[in-house]
Amino acid sequence: MLVAVVKELKQGEGRVACTPENVRKLTDAGHKVIVEKNAGIGSGFSNDMYEKEGAKIVTHEQAWEADLVIKVKEPHESEYQYFKKNQIIWGFLHLASSKEIVEKMQEVGVTAISGETIIKNGKAELLAPMSAIAGQRSAIMGAYYSEAQHGGQGTLVTGVHENVDIPGSTYVIFGGGVAATNAANVALGLNAKVIIIELNDDRIKYLQDMYAEKDVTVVKSTPENLAEQIKKADVFISTILIPGAKPPKLVTREMVKSMKKGSVLIDIAIDQGGTIETIRPTTISDPVYEEEGVIHYGVPNQPGTVPRTSTMALAQGNIDYILEICDKGLEQAIKDNEALSTGVNIYQGQVTNQGLATSHDLDYKEILNVIE
C-alpha cells in the first residue's frame, strides 16, 4: 500500500499527520511512504529527516496519487480534484460541517476515516489529546482577549491580591469532558473562578469530586441554567461535541446578548459546526470578531498553533491504526478492530456513520454490512 503524508493547506495549520519516527515504522514494515515537500516544516521536521527514515519527497499532486492519504484536517476544496475511487483519506475530517465534501467523496467513491469519531472503551481516543490542547489554549485566549487592547473588558483574569482584593474573572465552561477540564485547570491556575455546565449526572458527580477543594461550581445543564450562568461569564467556552454529527445551536443569540459587553466567547467545536448561534469559523491570522458586544473566537484548528506538541500527540495516537490498515488491508483491519470501524465515516462512497448521515440527511449503512 502506498502511503502519503500531505502538507496541510488550512490557514495557519502547522501540524503534520506523521513524524519521521512513524515513517520509519511504516518503512520497516515494508510499506512505501511518500511525503509532500515541506509537509513537516511547521512541526520542526525537515525533508531530510523524512528521507533518512525511508520516505520519498514528492509534490502535492504526486502525494495525492497514494492509496492512503494521511492528513491532519479535512481536505481543502482545491484538493477535491485529486480524490480517486477506493482511495483512503485519514484525518480529523469533521465531515458533518460540510455536505459538499461528503457529496464529492460519495461521487468519487472515497473511503474517509475520521479520527475524531474513533471510540475505544467509550472514549474518543485520538481526539482526546487535541481536545486537551484546545481546552488549555482556549483558557489562555480568553485571558488574552479580555485585555482592553484586544477589545475586551480590560480585565486581568487573575485579579489582584497584593494589599487589595480585586477578584479575578469568571470562566463559564459549557460541557464537562476532556476539553472542559483542561480549560478549567488552566483557568484555575490563573486564579479565575470556574463554572462548569454539564448534562450527565455521573459526570457532574465526578467533576464535583475532582474540584471539591477548588473554586469550581458544577451546574446541571438545562436551557434555564445555561441562560442564567452565561450572564456571569467574563469568558465563556463551549466544548460540546457530538462525534460525527453537527451539534444543535444551544447557545442562542438572546443568550449572547445577555452577556457582559467585552466578554469573550469561544467555541472549541466550531470545526463541527459549534453550539453557539452567533459563532462562525475564523482563522489563526484573523481569529476574532465582535457581535452583540461580545468578542467571538472561532478558530477551528487551535492545536495547529502549537504544532510541535500537537503533532507528537496525534502521531503517537494514530500510527498503530495506520500500521494495521497497511499490514492487513482496510477491510480486514475493520473486522479485527472495533475502534477503527467507528472511525470509518464513508466507505467507498457509502456513509457509514450514523451521526454524519443524520447531519446531512443521507442514507446510512452499518460498516460491517458494507465491506466485502
Q: Where are the model-predicted features located?
A:
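Glycine/serine-rich phosphate-binding loop and adjoining beta1-alpha1 elements at the start
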Residues: 2, 8, 75-169, 299-301
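An N-terminal-biased, well-structured beta-alpha scaffold segment characteristic
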Residues: 2-104, 108
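Glycine-rich phosphate/diphosphate-binding loop of Rossmann-like nucleotide-binding domains
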Residues: 6-40, 149-238, 288
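Generic hydrophobic/aromatic pocket-lining and core-packing "Φ" positions
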Residues: 23, 47, 102, 139, ...
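Adenosine-phosphate binding glycine-rich loop
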Residues: 116-160, 270, 275-372
